[in-house]
Amino acid sequence: MAGVKLLLLSLCVGYTAYHFYSSESMNPESVRGKRVLITGSSTGIGEQIAYEFARMGAHIMVTARRLQRLQEVANECLKLGAASAHYVASDMGNLTSAQYVAQEAVNKLGGLDYLVLNHIGGSASFGFFKGEMDPVVGSIYINFLSYVQLTSAALKALQESQGSIVVMSSMSGRIGAPFTTSYCASKFALEGFYSSLRREFALQNSNMSVTVAVLGYIDTENAVKKVGNKVSMSASSKEDCAREVVKAAVLKQPELFYPYWGIKPFVLLRDWFPGLVAKILDNFYILENIQ
């Protein structure tokens, strides 16, 4: 066991060093005038991603369910330097609505360079699976099928611009996590679909890119409210997370791990030492607060 722990530590240090010393730099001017659609952008990571693109002079469209919050986010984008800022209220539980959002973005922005898929939904609580099917169906519908519908509707515009698709995934899409069965299922589906799509772009010699952001526990209002008293770990900054997501998108990186040191080592070791990884991760849960 001591040898395994030493190996784990060595890999963590090695990959962390590689990550920081091999990081590419991003030219913000390359984003000026680009056209960006961000879903789930009335709050949390999506809101912060909108602000990051706005600071670089992009044309922004934000979408979520709350109209007033979208108006506020769009106004803030303009203050931060967005070339233009638009908004449309939508419910991603309706695939027709998802298709409409993509078409509206293309029409209002005159095309599309970045499709950022960030919304999340479903009625599943953080707890033991008790056999209910509605949360599973809802999660797959909103967190997977609507992503595919948006991609399908925006694909022609993205092909014309040789643009980028950015998908918010999770460590739960790489390593099955307890108490989030429906959420895990939707994230594993995202990982499979968009990894496959990325390979298709490459085989067509297309410059289109797919960036999958594999995220950990981020200090969004929704995440903290849902799991804050159920896990013994610190949440990472949503502002820092958004900056890293935008950087990865602009550089057309296939994957982003954030926080890097909290996710990448476990993903690397999952297949080698699955029992050890599960034991370490399970220690973060406060079982007496989970039903």
From Swiss-Prot:
Q: Which UniProt keywords apply?
A: NADP, Oxidoreductase, Secreted, Signal
Compartment annotation = Secreted
Instruction: List the InterPro entries hit by this protein, alphabetically.
Output: 11-beta-HSD (IPR051253), NAD(P)-bd_dom_sf (IPR036291), Sc_DH/Rdtase_CS (IPR020904), SDR_fam (IPR002347)
Matching entries from Pfam families are given as: adh_short
Detail which positions bind NADP(+). 40-66, 91-92, 118-120, 183-187, 216-222
The superkingdom listed in its UniProt entry is: Eukaryota
List the catalytic residues. 183 (proton acceptor)
Task: Report the record's disulfide bonds.
Answer: none
Q: What residue range is the signal peptide?
A: 1-18
Main enzyme class: oxidoreductase
Tell me a Gene Ontology molecular-function term this record carries.
Answer: oxidoreductase activity
Q: Please write the reaction equations for the catalytic activity of this protein.
A: cortisone + NADPH + H(+) = cortisol + NADP(+)
Under the cellular component aspect of Gene Ontology, which terms does the record hold?
extracellular region; intracellular membrane-bounded organelle
- Known EC number: 1.1.1.-
| Residues given in the record as substrate binding sites | 170
Coiled-coil residues are: none
Stored PANTHER family? HYDROXYSTEROID (11-BETA) DEHYDROGENASE 1-LIKE B-RELATED (PTHR44279), HYDROXYSTEROID 11-BETA-DEHYDROGENASE 1-LIKE PROTEIN B (PTHR44279:SF5)
Which family does the record claim for this protein? Belongs to the short-chain dehydrogenases/reductases (SDR) family.
User: Which function does this protein serve?
Assistant: Unidirectional NADP(+)-dependent cortisol dehydrogenase (in vitro).
> What is the name of this protein?
Hydroxysteroid 11-beta-dehydrogenase 1-like protein A
